[in-house]
């Protein structure tokens, strides 16, 4: 699902809300979440999951085209850990089609 599809879905489900309000709410939420992660904060949404940063130590990588060694610097990468309710939801029997795709 893309951001546009999420906005359309919410507009369909919440038809009493103006389209612009839904768009602004989604954009503001994503912007605030991005800013929080950029500031090193952890985001927890109960029942859904949590977003945090994981540290990646510096290492030597390889350029896949040339095979040349490349020094990769240390960095932080966003990480999502699903909550218990989300893990259980995606593993329900009625979601077996999803599980068969993987």
Swiss-Prot record:
GO cellular component terms, A-Z: chromosome; cytosol
Example of a GO MF term: DNA binding
Pfam families: Bac_DNA_binding (PF00216)
GO biological process, any: regulation of translation
Keyword terms, alphabetized: DNA recombination, DNA-binding, Transcription, Transcription regulation, Translation regulation
Keyword Nucleotide-binding listed: no
InterPro entries: Hist_DNA-bd, Histone-like_DNA-bd_CS, IHF-like_DNA-bd_dom_sf, IHF_beta
Quaternary assembly: Heterodimer of an alpha and a beta chain.
Family, as annotated: Belongs to the bacterial histone-like protein family.
Known role: This protein is one of the two subunits of integration host factor, a specific DNA-binding protein that functions in genetic recombination as well as in transcriptional and translational control.
The protein, known as: Integration host factor subunit beta
Phylogenetic placement of the source organism: Bacteria, Pseudomonadati, Pseudomonadota, Gammaproteobacteria, Oceanospirillales
Gene name of the record: ihfB
């Amino acid at each position: 699902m893309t951001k546009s599809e999420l906005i359309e879905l919410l507009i369909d489900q919440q038809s009493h809300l103006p389209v612009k309000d839904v768009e602004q709410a989604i954009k503001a939420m994503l912007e605030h979440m991005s800013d929080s992660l950029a500031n090193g904060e952890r985001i927890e949404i109960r029942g859904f999951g949590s977003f945090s940063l994981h540290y990646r130590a510096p290492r030597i990588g390889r350029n896949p085209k040339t095979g040349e060694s490349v020094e990769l610097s240390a960095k932080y990468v966003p990480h999502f850990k699903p909550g218990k309710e989300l893990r259980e939801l995606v593993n329900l029997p009625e979601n077996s089609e999803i599980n068969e795709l993987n």
